[in-house]
């Protein structure tokens, strides 16, 4: 069984391949970022991408396929819950929308290699 760090690194690398030249940030949030997770916790990951909000859905299938590939490779070690967010939209609203504010304050950035 892989550890969470390996899973996150593979996810971040795969995200870079999916988004190509688009600038992305991968951010761990929720119980894993706070350190209060348990055996049933999912791994919450936000992908902040420098894309218009209307294009967020365009990448969903590829991100889900990446998760399936990671699940196949590591035997469903963790349940990954991704969300794709337009970085320009996030930058505009991160002080107003509570979820975005928490993501900015509590999220842990994962290096995208």
Label every PLM stretch briefly.
Residues 31:
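Conserved H-loop
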Residues 44-48:
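Short beta-strand->loop micro-motif that forms the acidic, two-metal-ion catalytic signature
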């Amino acid at each position: 069984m892989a550890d969470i760090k390996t899973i996150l690194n593979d996810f971040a690398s795969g995200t870079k391949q999916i988004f190509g030249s688009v600038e992305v940030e991968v951010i761990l949030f929720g119980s894993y970022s706070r350190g209060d997770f348990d055996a049933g916790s999912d791994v919450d990951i936000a992908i902040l991408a420098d894309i218009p909000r209307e294009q967020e859905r365009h990448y969903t299938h590829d991100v889900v396929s990446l998760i399936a590939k990671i699940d196949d490779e590591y035997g469903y070690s963790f349940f990954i819950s991704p969300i794709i967010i337009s970085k320009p939209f996030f930058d505009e609203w991160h002080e107003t929308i509570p979820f975005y504010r928490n993501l900015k304050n509590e999220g842990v950035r994962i290096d995208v290699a």
